[in-house]
Every structure is written in structure tokens, then in C-alpha cells.
């Protein structure tokens, strides 16, 4: 069947999802509607409403937009059914109830930013970098009742350089995700008859192009949602662990640590965000969290080696390189990072 004859409802919210929607629209796929989150209140008094990146793109291209507060809302379900989608494509969206994902006859597939079954969860890109992985990728799979466990359709790997932060990996997987979304639709279309879908055994077709997730004996890494407390640096770990941790959360939301005065002089602790570090083969010369200042360079002792800080930001100040920070913060030797 030609791709133009498959009616697609696209579901997504952030910039990551826009690239996939854009690829479908620009390459002639038949996107009949878009589902995204409701506009979010922003501003000091929450008086303004900000549409999602996906909504903005959809409106620019005259695509109908649905923004349900609750995915089981009867009016939303009725409106969704009215588009008579053959297939639903999900990229960076919320959990879907069965009444939604089971609606189209060609199923609902998700583009997940990891090589499933590894890194099931809300933050797969972050956790892959945090764990020091050298490879991740994207997976398309059919949604089912459990999170990120459905039958796998296609997978594509993506190499993670040792110096890459999560922004680099995010961008790479965003474009790779758009490519695999199109290839998945093309694969499904290639297994369908040219004329009519009336007498097609859809279960047989979809099972024929997908396979159950196989866990074997490998340790499964999970990708839970990132919270502020998740981002606190533990200096009692190795320099490599801290280095990867910073990469995996930079530039957003950013890791942080509490800078405390060594002396009991009533000086208030400071919160420092750390955006970039560099590994060192020099052995630590003090307890974890204590600082080593060498002219324009700043190091932190970890459980094994010194870790150099390169790009930081104190609360209420602008982000800056360490050289600029040291020029304006003359008493840094009197501080250390909290480790408890």
C-alpha cells in the first residue's frame, strides 16, 4: 500500500518530536491530526499560555490539533475516532490508555530513544550518558499495556563519543528518530495489499514485522524521570563516574553541588551548577569534595583522581568558564563541596 493512503495520527510534545512530525509532513505521509499536551501557563503570574513545539509546527502546517487534559476523556476519544486513523505514531509523549493505543487497525508505535529493552523509562538519553555507555540508539515498537515493553519493529544504533554531553546525543537521536519513524511506516506499508484493507489479518501482518523484546541474561538499565535531587553530584564516586554524570545532565537540567565554607564563620553555603568537567590521571590529594586551585584551574578531589571543573554557574550569577570564575572569586581555597 502507498504511504499516502495510510491515515496517521501523530502524538508528541517537545522539540524532539517535531523533527519526526516534520519528516512525515515533508515526505508526503498522510498525517490527518496531531495530539499534544495542553498549553502550559508561563510567566511570573502564570498568566500566559505557551503552546508545545509540536503544536506550533502543526498549526503552521494547517494540521488539526487535539490537546486533551485526560486521555480517557469521552469527548477526546470521540474526536480521535473521527479521524479514522489507520496508525498512530508516538514520539516523546505521555502514557496512553489502551482505549487510545488499541484504536487504529495498524496499531500504535512509539519511537523510543534507546535500544530496548535497555533504558525503559522517561529519560533514556540522560541515563545512557550518565552510565558511560558508548552506544545507544532508537527503537520503534508497538505499544501494549506495560511501559516500553511492546514488540520491537526496528532499531538503529548511535555512537556516544567519550566527550559528548546529553545535548549532542539528544540532537543525534532526534534526527535518527525521524528517520526510523519513516522507515517503520514504510515497512508496515510494504506488507499491505495495494488496494483495500478490508480483508487483511492485521495481527498477522504486525506480528510478522516485529519481535518480542528479549532480555536474556544482560543487566537491564532503567531510565527513570530526572528530578532536582537526582542532579546532585556525589564526590565520593570516581572521577570517571562524576565526569559521566555531568555529561549526562548537561546543559539541562545541569548537575549541582553545595559549596560550603571550610571555617565555621557563618558564611552561607552556595549552590554551584557544573556544566563541564575534564578527567585527569592525577591521583586525588585530599578527601572527596575538597578543592585544588592551580592558578587559573580548579580541581575537585574524588574517590580516586582529580576532576577539573571547566564550566560552572553560581546561583544568581551567569554561567562562566572557571578562569573567569576564579578571577572574581578570590577566596575559593576557603571552600569545599558538601559530600553528605
Task: Show which residues each predicted segment covers.
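N-terminal glycine-/serine-/threonine-rich beta1-alpha1-beta2 phosphate-ribose binding loop
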Residues: 41-84
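N-terminal Rossmann-like dinucleotide-binding module
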Residues: 1-45
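Internal anion-binding site segments
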Residues: 210-340
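Donor/substrate-binding cores of folate-linked one-carbon enzymes
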Residues: 6, 27-30, 87-222, 229
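Short beta->alpha connector loops
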Residues: 13-16, 69-72, 92-95, 280
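Structural motif corresponding to alpha-helix initiation and N-cap regions
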Residues: 18, 51, 73-77, 94, ...
Amino acid at each position: 500500500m502507498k504511504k499516502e493512503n495510510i491515515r496517521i495520527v501523530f502524538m508528541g510534545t517537545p522539540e524532539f518530536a517535531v523533527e519526526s512530525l516534520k519528516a512525515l509532513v515533508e515526505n508526503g505521509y498522510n498525517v490527518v491530526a496531531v495530539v499534544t499536551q495542553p498549553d502550559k501557563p508561563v510567566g511570573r503570574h502564570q498568566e500566559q499560555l505557551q503552546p508545545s513545539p509540536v503544536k506550533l509546527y502543526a498549526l503552521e502546517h494547517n494540521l488539526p490539533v487535539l490537546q486533551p487534559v485526560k486521555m480517557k476523556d469521552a469527548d477526546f476519544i470521540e474526536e480521535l475516532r473521527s479521524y479514522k486513523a489507520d496508525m498512530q505514531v508516538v514520539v516523546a509523549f505521555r502514557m496512553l490508555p489502551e482505549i487510545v493505543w488499541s484504536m487504529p487497525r495498524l496499531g500504535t508505535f512509539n519511537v523510543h530513544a534507546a535500544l530496548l529493552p535497555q533504558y525503559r523509562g522517561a529519560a533514556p538519553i540522560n541515563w545512557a550518558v550518565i552510565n558511560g555507555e558508548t552506544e545507544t540508539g532508537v527503537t520503534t515498537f508497538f505499544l501494549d499495556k506495560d511501559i516500553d515493553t511492546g514488540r520491537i519493529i526496528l532499531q538503529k544504533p548511535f555512537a556516544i563519543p567519550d566527550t559528548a554531553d546529553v545535548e549532542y546525543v539528544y540532537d543525534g537521536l532526534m534526527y535518527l528518530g525521524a528517520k526510523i519513524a519513516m522507515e517503520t511506516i514504510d515497512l508496515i506499508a510494504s506488507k499491505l495489499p495495494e488496494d483495500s484493507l478490508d480483508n487483511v489479518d492485521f495481527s498477522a501482518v504486525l506480528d510478522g514485522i516485529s519481535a518480542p523484546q528479549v532480555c536474556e541474561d544482560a543487566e537491564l538499565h532503567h531510565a527513570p524521570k530526572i528530578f532536582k535531587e537526582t542532579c546532585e553530584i556525589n564526590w565520593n564516586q570516581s572521577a570517571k563516574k562524576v565526569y559521566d554524570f555531568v555529561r549526562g545532565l548537561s546543559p539541562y537540567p545541569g548537575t549541582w553541588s553545595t559549596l560550603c565554607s571550610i571555617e565555621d564563620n557563618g558564611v552561607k553555603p552556595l549552590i554551584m551548577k557544573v556544566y563541564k568537567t575534564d578527567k585527569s590521571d592525577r591521583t586525588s590529594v585530599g578527601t572527596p569534595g575538597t578543592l585544588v586551585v592551580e592558578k587559573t584551574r580548579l580541581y575537585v578531589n574524588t574517590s580516586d583522581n582529580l576532576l577539573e571543573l571547566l564550566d560552572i554557574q553560581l546561583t544568581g550569577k551567569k554561567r562562566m568558564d572557571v578562569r573567569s570564575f576564579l578571577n572574581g572569586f578570590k577566596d575559593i581555597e576557603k571552600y569545599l563541596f558538601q559530600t553528605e
